[in-house]
């Protein structure tokens, strides 16, 4: 009132009138006194990014932040200090009451209450911002430093558990809001009874926990059912197709709706705000008319309460007549000479329209008024005819739209109305997209953009606030096929090469991919030198976007099975990734990367945010944003405003789709969220190859952000550390000594960081052989799990996994370091190298194995630490059997007995969760034939481990999953394979040494398809030693004795009394259980002592005498003079030649 009366009085009195205002500001400052002034000033200067990680406990799996014990103690002290302060003045009390009551509104209010005169931004009192804590609230500027209570994930609807009589606009939790006084909302699955008091509003409303909402099978009402993602209720399994998350009925309806237009966003764009009363009524009539038509043809009737009611045909005719009367003076010169409707808009008319239109809304309405010649002609037709049919009316409106849409779209694509006429005419001559095609399909309007025009002028950002009406009307009045879906996002960029003389280059949007330009071409050195920072002014490919845009890429419409989520149906190749196996039965290292889940990282840097501003349903929003593709997901936060690193395991096709359409996906994230966490402020999103920035409705895609000085880890040693021990890691990679580089390590939801010291020699800063060290603290409670080692410099870098396990498993995993250190990373800037990277190389295969093993160890550690049967069993249950199969094959092929045993123990724990999982696990183990593989490799240690592995069931019964008589292909058992292999005595010994002695019993009785036993196989291949070994074991078992081979002699140990009392008592005292122990101990106990007999022992004397006798005889014969009766005497010395 004072500001309205002020101009009527003298200036001194006006200044005197506003004197009562300062007490309000003083009261606000007095309320802010209990908070540390330095902390508040620092928070305002830093934009909320100077928060202390020790004050928050972060759940890396649920993506929720809670105040730590230190924060609770600090808040308790502050609350006690606040109670001793003076009560706030009445004006401030009224303001606080207004804040509390403002949360009950439907959309929230932006109020400037005068508490701070210097505050330029209005105070947000929307339900998401009016969080009430247990203690009196500080001023809004210091609110982030305070612990909030659980806020609702969405506005609570009537009838939901969160809207029960709890009062006050609800915190979303509701406590016992599900029913009566002492009850609480619980999951409807049999034997679950999960408390949904603190669960999301969606889960409380539908009475299903998060786990059973995603599982493929659940027992509900003594019947196996599955939760439908679209119906939000359970259906029998017979109503679902294999691999589908929605029932067939809803999928069929989705397929029908998919072929129609989606006018939801168009209708929301066309609505004029209620406070814009200065706009002309004719513009309101045009917009409302087209809005009604959009509502008639869509499936969203009743979803938008602000849309006017549907009039009958008489009212529509009256509106058109009104428009005709307004433009009667101008319609004669612009109407076509023929009374028939001309669906082809002339080029000259479009050119004039382009010259007259601008980006502002007022000039756009003028363009709409000048393009109503179709309405004028048809209005005359209405006077001549009787009541026209509905199809005739829709034809008239489509004609008018055909003549009005090119202006708006062209204005949108051009970005400015002062372009030269030469460029416009040239653009129209080379782009026939504005002309309706000759096949009489539905009208399509696309923007025309010249290549040179787009390259010469600098990019411009088109910002569309929520309160403004977009200056374009991308509306189709008739149903169309998939080919007719326009993609407005790509139009300006797709036709940059439209001047090409090759007709194949000028493809229509219906046959072109969503983004045809190359965001990351091969860069020169000069380009890399220019792009040295990721700052806000970096050269970017700026695409015109607004919050109202929801048009998904064209290629995504080809899927007819998965439900539409956030306005974008997923790619059809997703389902094949879910059902595909991770590796081959014979060679796991030759599997294709497309059939495996890839582990990657998405980083969000949120400016001006801190953990208190993170919504409670952040995990659900990210999962919905990624179209439920992630199989695994973890997140870690650290200061620097708020840096959220998301590690996800998704199919390779999902990663590729995200990289190709990151700009559009970020728009979907902002528009699909109901919270201001994404909509307001500024944030960056980084994947492995792209960077997108968002600020106040404008989205940018970085043209090239990876530079030649980007730090990159190529090797970490050791790759496996013992849990609970302090370890020093050696990091190798590129550009690790650049100033500003930091090393981070994820640990139990927090980060351990280290600043890299700059190299003393400037010439060695940018090199490919940097070496750094990083010390791990060795947390005692962390026995099994995984670290992620990250390097970062200016929001660029990569990560490397490190496994946490026991010493024996770490020793086996460290054998992979040779494979990792010997190979190099693939440079993704080259197309050829990127194509070759599609085939997993040895290093990629090792990293994939470490990532998968890390996900499993994380789940196993969580289940072990929690010691909750329900949560732990269900947690491991979602680690698929196919992924277990891959890990078992990879480990067993390398003869890692310790790791294989650990994996089998975790698998056994998982299989005990349900009978179906047990059956599925046994089928998987029977398919991969681990024992057969060990026999072929002649791995006696692995074979002995497998045949002796036992699973103890809940009823104390024992199950041996690896039996030596299990028949494989052709009826061959592991015994047959061992009998046919040479030098496999140890393998036969291990197979016939199983606890149940099945191997001994089946050596003669197990037959293959040809009726041959293992004994026969051994005889045919002259492996008689195997039969002798088995026969000796059978005799020993029959006689209750043990046979030990010492050299080539057999020593029989009769356990019934054949051995001396001394030896017998010694053996019984040692309780020999293993044949190896028997051989070692009994060889020392039973070997007779050999007394030294010197050199005159009898065997030596006999040999020496024999040799001496032979030597004497030879010498006598050779030296004697021989005489013969005939001939002269013979002497050996004169022997030359002659006869004897």
From Swiss-Prot:
Binding site for Zn(2+) 1: 187, 192, 209, 212
Basic and acidic residues: bias regions: 450-466
Region feature Disordered, mapped onto this chain: 73-112, 124-177, 327-382, 403-472, 496-517, 558-597
Tissue expression notes: Expressed in stems, leaf sheaths, and young panicles.
Biased composition (Gly residues): 164-177
Cellular component, GO annotation: nucleus
Family matches, as InterPro entries: SBP-like, SBP_dom, SBP_sf
Entry annotated with the keyword Transcription regulation: yes
Domain-related comment: The SBP-type zinc finger is required for the binding to DNA.
Function according to Swiss-Prot or TrEMBL: Trans-acting factor that binds specifically to the consensus nucleotide sequence 5'-TNCGTACAA-3'.
Name of the protein described by the UniProt record: Squamosa promoter-binding-like protein 15
Organism: Oryza sativa subsp. indica
Organism ancestry: Eukaryota, Viridiplantae, Streptophyta, Embryophyta, Tracheophyta
């Amino acid at each position: 009132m004072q500001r309205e009366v002020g101009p009527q009085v003298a200036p001194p009195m006006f200044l005197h009138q506003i004197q009562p205002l300062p007490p309000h500001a003083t009261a606000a400052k007095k309320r802010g006194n209990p908070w540390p002034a330095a902390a508040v000033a620092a928070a305002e200067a830093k934009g909320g990014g100077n928060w202390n990680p020790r004050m928050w406990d972060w759940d890396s799996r649920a993506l929720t932040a809670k105040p730590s014990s230190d924060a609770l103690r600090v808040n308790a002290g502050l609350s006690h200090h606040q109670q001793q302060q003076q009560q706030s003045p009445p004006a401030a009390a009224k303001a606080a009451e207004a804040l509390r009551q403002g949360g009950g509104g439907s959309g929230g209010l932006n109020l400037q209450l005068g508490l701070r005169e210097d505050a330029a931004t209005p105070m947000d009192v929307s339900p998401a911002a009016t969080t009430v804590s247990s203690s009196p609230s500080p001023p809004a500027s210091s609110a982030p430093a305070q612990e909030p209570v659980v806020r609702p994930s969405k506005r609570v609807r009537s009838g939901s558990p969160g809207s029960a009589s709890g009062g006050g606009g609800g915190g979303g939790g509701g406590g016992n809001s599900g029913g009566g006084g002492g009850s609480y909302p619980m999951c409807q699955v049999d034997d679950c009874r999960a408390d949904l008091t603190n669960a999301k509003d969606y889960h409380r409303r539908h009475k299903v926990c998060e786990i059973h909402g995603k599982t493929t099978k659940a027992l509900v009402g003594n019947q196996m059912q599955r939760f439908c993602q679209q119906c939000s209720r359970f259906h029998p399994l017979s109503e679902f197709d294999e691999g589908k998350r929605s029932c067939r009925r809803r999928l069929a309806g989705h397929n029908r709706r998919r072929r129609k237009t989606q006018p939801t966003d168009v209708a929301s764009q066309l609505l004029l705000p209620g406070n814009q009363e200065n706009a002309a009524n004719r513009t309101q009539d045009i917009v409302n008319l087209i809005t009604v038509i959009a509502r008639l043809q869509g499936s969203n009737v009743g979803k938008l309460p602000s849309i006017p009611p549907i009039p009958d045909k008489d009212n529509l005719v009256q509106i058109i007549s009104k428009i005709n009367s307004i433009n009667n003076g101008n319609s004669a010169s612009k109407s076509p000479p023929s009374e028939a409707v001309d669906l082809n808009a002339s080029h000259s008319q479009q050119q004039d329209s382009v010259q007259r239109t601008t980006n502002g809304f007022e000039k756009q309405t003028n363009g709409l008024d000048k393009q109503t010649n179709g309405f004028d002609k048809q209005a005359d037709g209405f006077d001549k005819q009787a009541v026209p049919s509905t199809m005739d009316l829709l034809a008239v409106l489509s004609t008018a739209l055909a003549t009005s849409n090119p202006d708006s779209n062209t204005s949108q694509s051009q970005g400015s109305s002062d372009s030269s006429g030469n460029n416009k005419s040239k653009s129209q001559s080379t782009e026939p997209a504005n002309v309706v095609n000759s096949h009489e399909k539905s009208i399509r309007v696309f923007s025309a953009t010249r290549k040179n025009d787009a390259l010469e002028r600098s990019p411009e950002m088109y910002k569309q606030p929520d309160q403004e009406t977009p200056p374009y009307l991308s509306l189709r009045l008739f149903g169309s096929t998939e080919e007719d879906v326009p993609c407005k996002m790509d139009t300006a960029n797709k036709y940059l090469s439209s001047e090409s003389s090759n007709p194949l280059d000028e493809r229509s949007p219906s046959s072109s991919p969503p983004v045809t330009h190359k965001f990351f071409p091969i860069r020169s050195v000069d380009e890399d030198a220019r792009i040295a920072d990721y700052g806000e002014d970096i050269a970017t490919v700026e695409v015109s976007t607004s919050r109202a845009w929801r048009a998904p890429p064209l290629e995504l419409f080809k899927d007819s099975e998965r439900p539409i989520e956030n306005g974008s149906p997923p790619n059809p190749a997703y389902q094949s990734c879910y059902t595909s196996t991770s590796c081959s039965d014979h060679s796991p290292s030759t599997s294709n990367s497309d059939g495996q889940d890839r582990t990657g990282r998405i980083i969000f840097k949120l400016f001006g945010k801190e953990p208190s501003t993170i919504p409670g349903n952040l995990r659900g929003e990210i999962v919905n944003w990624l179209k439920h593709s992630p199989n695994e997901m973890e997140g870690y936060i650290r200061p620097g405003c708020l840096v959220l690193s998301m590690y996800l395991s998704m199919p390779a096709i999902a990663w590729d789709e995200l990289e190709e359409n990151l700009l559009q996906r970020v728009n979907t994230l902002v528009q699909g969220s109901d919270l201001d966490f994404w909509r307001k402020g500024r944030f960056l999103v980084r994947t492995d190859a792209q960077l997108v920035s968002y600020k106040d409705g404008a989205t940018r895609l970085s043209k090239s952000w990876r530079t030649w000085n980007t730090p990159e880890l190529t090797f970490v040693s050791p790759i496996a550390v013992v849990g609970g021990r302090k370890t020093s890691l050696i990091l190798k990679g590129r550009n690790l000594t650049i100033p500003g580089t930091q090393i981070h390590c994820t640990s139990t939801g927090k980060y351990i960081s280290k600043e890299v010291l700059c190299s003393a020699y400037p010439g060695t800063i940018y090199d490919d052989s940097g070496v750094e060290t990083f010390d791990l603290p060795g947390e005692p409670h962390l026995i099994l799990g995984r670290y992620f080692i990250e390097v970062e410099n200016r929001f660029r870098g990569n990560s490397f996994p490190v496994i946490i396990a026991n010493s024996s498993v770490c020793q086996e995993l460290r054998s992979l370091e040779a494979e990792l250190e010997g190979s190099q990373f693939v440079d993704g800037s080259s197309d050829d190298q990127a194509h070759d990277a599609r085939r997993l190389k040895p290093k990629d295969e090792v990293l994939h194995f470490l990532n998968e093993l890390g996900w499993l160890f994380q789940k196993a550690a969580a289940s072990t630490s929690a010691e909750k049967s329900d949560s732990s069993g269900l947690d491991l249950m979602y680690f698929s059997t196919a992924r277990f199969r891959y890990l078992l094959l990879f480990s067993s092929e390398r003869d890692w007995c310790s790791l294989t045993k650990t994996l089998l123990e975790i698998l056994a724990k998982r299989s005990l969760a349900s009978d179906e999982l047990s059956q599925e696990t046994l089928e998987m183990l029977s398919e991969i034939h681990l024992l057969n593989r060990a026999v072929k490799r002649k791995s006696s240690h692995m074979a002995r481990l497998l045949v002796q592995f036992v699973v103890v069931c809940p009823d104390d019964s024992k199950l041996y999953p690896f039996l030596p008589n299990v028949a494989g292909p052709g009826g061959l058992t592991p015994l047959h394979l061992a009998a046919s292999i040479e030098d496999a005595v140890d393998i036969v010994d291990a197979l016939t040494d199983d606890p149940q002695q099945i191997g001994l019993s089946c050596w003669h009785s197990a037959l293959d398809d040809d009726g041959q036993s293992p004994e026969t196989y051994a005889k045919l291949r002259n492996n008689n030693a195997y039969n002798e070994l088995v026969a000796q074991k059978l005799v020993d078992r029959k006689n209750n004795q043990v046979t030990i081979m010492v050299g080539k002699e057999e020593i029989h140990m009769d356990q019934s009394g054949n051995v001396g009392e001394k030896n017998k008592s010694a053996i019984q005292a040692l309780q020999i259980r293993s044949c190896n122990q028997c051989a070692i101990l009994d060889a020392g106990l039973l070997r007779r002592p050999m007394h030294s007999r010197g050199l005159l022992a009898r065997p030596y004397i006999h040999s020496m005498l024999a040799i001496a006798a032979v030597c004497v005889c030879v010498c006598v014969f050779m030296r004697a003079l021989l005489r013969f009766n005939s001939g002269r005497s013979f002497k050996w010395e004169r022997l030359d030649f002659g006869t004897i």
